[in-house]
Amino acid sequence: MLRRTFIALAAVTAFIPAFAQSVVGQEAPRELTDAERQLITDINTHNSGVKTMVGRFLQIDTQGQRIEGTFFIERPGKVLFRYNPPSYEQIVSVGRGFYVVDRKEQTQYAYPQDKVPLRQFLDAEIDLFKANLVAINQSDDYVSLTLQDDTPRGVVRVALVFDIESKDLRQWTLTEPSGNELTFSLYDVEYDVTIPKAYFYIDPTFRAVNAPPNT
């Protein structure tokens, strides 16, 4: 079972579109065909019906560094990404922005909104037609929808990869204005499970600190 999981994960990771690997620049919104519009409608409908998600993730950065962890998502707006040991960090949203919490140092700092592309996916009702969709790339099994944001730091792009048959989110790749990338692949995902309320919590006694310079 574990071997099949990682084979599937490798297949999704290999599908990262080539256009997500270049330095980001402004692009005009993409004109959609009727078939593409129907596919996005189906993705919106399916994922709007999923209220909670729980599973594991693999994060890969531009240098190829790999970090794993577990995630918990509850719509609207609640997120917990917990990195595996030896890290004590986790990314938390309780519906009022995103924060990086260090459980060992008992600190927290605000995480830039434009570095959390999953926010496109956290509303109670998902409507990707409202996003600035600039590219679509499709294989037999997966479709990648590339969304673009113009932020104070420059143009940020995210490629969301969905399973064509199930319409489930499998992966996203964030491309920063510098061209640096961060890819999250999801696996062992369970849907519509009960998540303890305590998971979406930031201890008010944790000290607020400035974000690291490279954040």
Which residues are covered by each model-predicted region?
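An acidic-aromatic
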Residues: 70-120, 182
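Gly/Pro-enriched, hydrophobic low-complexity segments
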Residues: 129-131, 138-214
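A short, Trp-centered hydrophobic/proline-enriched beta-strand micro-motif
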Residues: 45-62
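N-terminal export leaders
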Residues: 3-7
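Boundary at the C-terminal end of the N-terminal hydrophobic targeting segment
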Residues: 18-27
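Bacterial N-terminal signal peptides
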Residues: 10-18
